[in-house]
Amino acid sequence: MEFWGIEVKSGKPVTVTPEEGILIHVSQASLGECKNKKGEFVPLHVKVGNQNLVLGTLSTENIPQLFCDLVFDKEFELSHTWGKGSVYFVGYKTPNIEPQGYSEEEEEEEEEVPAGNAAKAVAKPKAKPAEVKPAVDDEEDESDSDGMDEDDSDGEDSEEEEPTPKKPASSKKRANETTPKAPVSAKKAKVAVTPQKTDEKKKGGKAANQSPKSASQVSCGSCKKTFNSGNALESHNKAKHAAAK
């Protein structure tokens, strides 16, 4: 850092050209010696390129100086409208240190980049690399999924076993089946028994009827065949033996 200062006389603007790689910081402007203090106002002007700006206004009575913070890296011009004295501008000079890894060429390249490419360049850093989970997490996920499958299978088994409460109804049926039926009345028992007796009688009657038939069998004298009735024997004799005679 190096002190810098300049005197600007009445009606004589001063042009200041910073050295290459140097910045000029203007921090204060003040009026010179003034014999007549009647509250006269003194505007201060600064011109940079084609722009002529008012830096501030001093007063011989109330505002003999003002503080500012202006930095110039190229040629500029200072002036004022006070015709009774000089105005002094002071400040300091510092080297124009550019950030490391950054130059004017890079700045020009960035300005030439199209807006679309700039948007892509901005969008790319947003993409985050996919996080790789450790194998332990995979095993835990598998165990969790197995646990879920077991829970699902248990849920299905429980759902399949839910219809079992219907068993009490079947037990009631079994209870009804096992319970002894009401005793059958004597009349019904007799009615149920009598058909058996009649069947036995029928069977017995047939057997009795068959025995006389077997006793009344007749045999043919010529061929010694037996017949159950005489009519059968007669028809046999007519058919067999009468034709032979």
Curated annotation (Swiss-Prot):
Biased composition (Acidic residues): 103-113, 137-162
Gene Ontology MF, one: histone deacetylase activity
InterPro entries reported in the protein's UniProt record: NPL, Znf_C2H2_type
Modified residues (Phosphoserine): S211
Zn-finger region bounds: C2H2-type: 218-241
Gene3D superfamilies reported in the protein's UniProt record: Nucleoplasmin core domain
Keyword annotations of the record: Acetylation, Chromatin regulator, Developmental protein, Hydrolase, Metal-binding, Nucleus, Phosphoprotein, Repressor, Transcription, Transcription regulation, Zinc, Zinc-finger
UniProt tissue specificity: Expressed in leaves, roots, stems, young plantlets, flowers and siliques. Highest levels in ovules, embryos, shoot apical meristems and first leaves. Also expressed in somatic embryos.
Residues carrying N-acetylmethionine: M1
Compositional bias per record (Polar residues), positions renumbered to this chain: 208-234
Cell compartment(s), UniProt: Nucleus, Nucleolus
Major location category of this protein: nucleus
Any one of the GO BP annotations: seed dormancy process
Region (Disordered): 99-245
Effect of D69A: No effect on transcriptional repression activity
GO cellular component, one term: nucleolus
Biased composition (Low complexity): 114-124, 178-195
Chain positions covered by the region annotation Required to repress transcription: 2-5, 101-162
Miscellaneous notes: Loss-of-function mutant (antisense inhibition) induces increased methylation of histone H3 'Lys-4' and hypomethylation of DNA at rDNA repeats.
Quaternary structure, from the entry: Interacts with DNMT2. Interacts with DEK3.
Summary of the function given for this chain in its UniProt record: Probably mediates the deacetylation of lysine residues on the N-terminal part of the core histones (H2A, H2B, H3 and H4). Histone deacetylation gives a tag for epigenetic repression and plays an important role in transcriptional regulation, cell cycle progression and developmental events. Required for histone H3 'Lys-9' deacetylation. Involved in rRNA gene silencing in nucleolar dominance. Seems to be implicated in the regulation of genes involved in seeds development.
Family statement drawn from the similarity comment of this UniProt entry: Belongs to the histone deacetylase HD2 family.
Protein name (database record): Histone deacetylase HDT1
Organism of derivation: Arabidopsis thaliana
Encoding gene, per UniProt annotation: HDT1
